UniProtKB/Swiss-Prot annotation:
Single GO term (MF): serine-type endopeptidase inhibitor activity
Function, in words: Inhibitor of trypsin and chymotrypsin.
Domain BPTI/Kunitz inhibitor: 8-58
Gene Ontology biological process terms in this record: envenomation resulting in negative regulation of voltage-gated potassium channel activity in another organism
Compartmental location: Secreted
Signal peptide start-end: none
GO cellular component: extracellular space
First-listed, main subcellular location of the protein, grouped into a coarse class: secreted
Listed name of the protein: Proteinase inhibitor
Length: 61
């Protein structure tokens, strides 16, 4: 879907909050899901709780 495409191609966004959750972001250059720190608010759709969730959503982009 277009939403999935946009989610999987967006850069990681920590957001303004400071919670520091470990999340995964799909990197279109490396074709891998990579960990990053998520602050807990705002951000974008390219943010997954697990590497597997990220791969399930974004493999093939």
């Amino acid at each position: 879907t277009e939403r999935g495409f946009l989610d999987c191609t967006s850069p990681p966004v920590t957001g303004p909050c400071r919670a520091g959750f470990k999340r995964y972001n799909y990197n279109t250059r490396t074709k891998q899901c990579e960990p990053f720190k998520y602050g807990g608010c705002k951000g974008n759709g390219n943010r997954y709780k697990s590497e597997q969730d990220c791969l399930d959503a974004c493999s093939g982009f």
